[in-house]
Amino acid sequence: MNKTIISVAALSCLAATMQAQKKAAAQRPNIVYIMCDDHAFQCISAYGHAIGKLAPTPNIDRIAERGMRFDKAFVENSLSTPSRACLMTGLYSHQNGQRQLGEGIDTSRTFFTELLQDAGYQTAIIGKWHMGCDPKGFDYYHIYNDQGQYWNPQYRGTDTPEGKYIVEEGYSTDLSTDHAIDFMNHRDKSKPFCLMLHHKAPHRNWQANIKYLGKYDNVNFPMPETFYDDYATRGEAVRTQKMSVTKHMRWEQDFKVPEMLDLNNEDSKDSYNALMGEINRMTPAQRSAWGRYYFPRNRKLLEANLKGKELDNWKYQAYIRDYMSVIASVAESVGRVLAYLDR
């Protein structure tokens, strides 16, 4: 009799504890933070820019419609890794140690995910980390090697043997989304969670998923008013940046025209080798599909022998079409995450 009472009492206490945990979790919202790398606001159709109207992103727009659209928000640092460091610490770059690429974040600083853990959250990060240290304040992580690769990226994390990097076949945006949904499926349901899904996309050099190659070939995107701006009257920072489509983007790697290789030019050879490194990562099927799109396009370019502003326009269209095709995968990923959360 006593044993039964004790057992019932224990079960009652356990049930009460579980109910209290569920109630507490319900009062603390789950957090899903999706971060892209070099994603211009003009390319999110919720902002009403001409580019967004021609290449709409309805899944991303749903977030703006359901919540808040930030029109006057600015990053503390516009570089990828330093920007993430500001996010993780809530501190300016000169305070968190990550002022530019190549520097390491001050890991003695508190990451906001550590505070969430203290508040009972289960935390996870998937995709791009690139901070020069192991993720801190995360119960689960599955991160790229370095800044990651678009095709068949390497991941390591709390679920890989001995923390070693493992190549996973597929497109990085899709794979990271798969892992994010898998985490949400298998998380501790008694706790609220914070999931950070960090994409490589749409970082340079804009390698689109095979299914989106050519998606915008029939779209003529308007060239920005500043396309030919030399920034002569602007500040030193903007004047000295290498951000011109016509002057600084490279034929081989950026425009994906390996036929332009100049064996007498070191920059051309470096650009070609960088592109070949990406192509050689692909499976035979991926490589074949890539070639079926780019090689005919490149032949037309070489035959046309464009000059002057016609060539400038070709470069801009090639760039922005690849860029928006990469964003198409990001928008698809957002849609998948929202569909999961809506279930």
Question: What is the role of each PLM region?
Answer:
Residues 2-4, 9-13, 18-343:
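Formylglycine-dependent sulfatase
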